[in-house]
Amino acid sequence: MGDKTKVQVSKLKPGRYILIDGEPCRIGNITVSSPGKHGSAKARIEAVGIFDGKVRSIVKPTSAEVDVPIIDKRTAQIIAMTPDTVQIMDMETYELYDVPIETGVADEIKGQLKEGINVEYWETLGRIKIMKIKGE
């Protein structure tokens, strides 16, 4: 799978995802300037990185195409925990992944993780992040 696709800037909406500088980001705000006498309308996109939490912004013509990541949302079970990594097993394919706690776990759930619970994780561009704890 290519893990990314192209989408026209005018089709983007807040809450969707975009690649900025090779980093998958969630769009927070889009402002579109009106076209001038000698130019096309421009869109200013402000987004927050999924993995690093940094705020990024870009300005592009609304007719331009940008890369959008394909995010695979799956369920896994926590098999083992070490001080700096979490080992998870996919519930469908039974593949094992080692996820670093610092960059691969959402801040809201870092203290709630324990062995044996099910979690939802996102995989995109060869990277994994545990996003939330799944209910039983």
From Swiss-Prot:
UniProt xrefs under InterPro entries: IF5A-like (IPR001884), IF5A-like_N (IPR048670), NA-bd_OB-fold (IPR012340), Rib_uL2_dom2 (IPR014722), Trans_elong_IF5A_hypusine_site (IPR019769), Transl_elong_IF5A_arc (IPR022847), Transl_elong_IF5A_C (IPR020189), Translation_prot_SH3-like_sf (IPR008991)
Subcellular location: Cytoplasm
SUPFAM superfamilies per UniProt: Nucleic acid-binding proteins (SSF50249), Translation proteins SH3-like domain (SSF50104)
SMART domains per record: eIF-5a
Coiled coil: none
Sorted UniProt keywords: Cytoplasm, Hypusine, Initiation factor, Protein biosynthesis
Example of a GO biological process term: positive regulation of translational termination
Record-stated family: Belongs to the eIF-5A family.
Organism: Thermococcus onnurineus (strain NA1)
Cysteines engaged in disulfide bonds, as pairs: none
One Gene Ontology cellular component: cytoplasm
Residues carrying Hypusine: 37
An MF annotation (GO) of this entry: translation initiation factor activity
The name this protein goes by in its record: Translation initiation factor 5A
Summary of the function given for this chain in its UniProt record: Functions by promoting the formation of the first peptide bond.
HAMAP family (UniProt xref): eIF_5A
Pfam family, one: eIF-5a
